[in-house]
Design a protein with these regions (language model features):
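N-proximal helix/coil linker or "cap" segments that precede and/or mark the start of modular domains
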Residues: 1-26, 41-44, 96-100
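A short beta-strand-turn-helix
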Residues: 24-47, 71-72
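Short active-site neighborhood of thiol/selenol oxidoreductases, capturing the structured segment around
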Residues: 36-60, 66, 79-84
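Loop/turn elements at helix/coil->beta-strand transitions in domains of secreted/extracellular proteins
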Residues: 42-47, 74-81, 105-110, 138-141
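Solvent-exposed loop/turn segments at secondary-structure junctions
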Residues: 53-58, 85-90, 115-120, 129, ...
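Structural microenvironment flanking redox-active thiols in thiol-disulfide oxidoreductases
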Residues: 60-104, 116-121
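Short, internal strand/loop/helix patches
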Residues: 97-139, 147
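Thiol-/selenol-based redox modules, centered on thioredoxin-like
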Residues: 135-173
Length: 173
């Protein structure tokens, strides 16, 4: 295994040479309810974390597929969560716009935001392509590599499903 000398892999912090932690956060969902990464991740065998923004056509185009995945995931002890980059810091206009897009797309899964200066906020700002989707296990570890690009693309959903299957196989909760 090639782990960089600083022990940092893909923007998170490492628990050991094989795992990368998703940055911990406390924030709110788009309805103003408190959300913490600890409770979110520990409550699910896997969490699909999708980074998107409101004016990104491929991002908006996959919201329906992500909602269908969320409904399917619930039966397997998992969830889908969205992080809209425009809502970092709790900008009221951006939150209203995101809620409008989600409603029009029929997406009912939770979307969260947090302080832009937090570790998770910095992680979000370092996402270089949208949409980008991560799978996080019950312990807050990122599973495999992120899916870059819409999950509606060729092979993307299969790759995402493989990460979910890995998280489920490794779940010790």
């Amino acid at each position: 295994e090639d782990v960089p000398s600083d022990g940092i892999v893909s923007g998170g912090t490492t628990a050991d040479s094989n795992t990368t932690k998703f940055p911990a956060f406390t924030g709110k969902d788009l309805d103003g309810n408190d959300v913490s990464s600890d409770k979110l991740f520990s409550g699910n065998a896997f969490t699909v974390v999708n980074f998107w923004f409101t004016t990104c056509k491929p991002c908006v185009g996959e919201l329906g597929d992500l909602d269908a995945l969320h409904k399917e995931a619930a039966g397997k002890g998992g969830a889908v969560v969205g992080i809209n980059a425009f809502t970092l810091g709790g900008d009221a206009g951006a939150i209203a716009d995101a809620k409008d897009v989600l409603t029009k797309s029929g997406a009912t899964y939770q979307n969260v935001y947090f302080d832009a200066d937090s570790e998770a906020g910095k992680f979000t700002e370092n996402v270089y392509a949208y949409p980008t989707t991560y799978v996080v296990d019950r312990n807050g570890n990122i599973v495999g590599d992120p899916i870059v690009g819409a999950i509606t693309g060729d092979g993307q959903m299969e790759a995402l499903q493989a990460l979910i299957d890995t998280a489920l196989a490794n779940d010790k909760g």
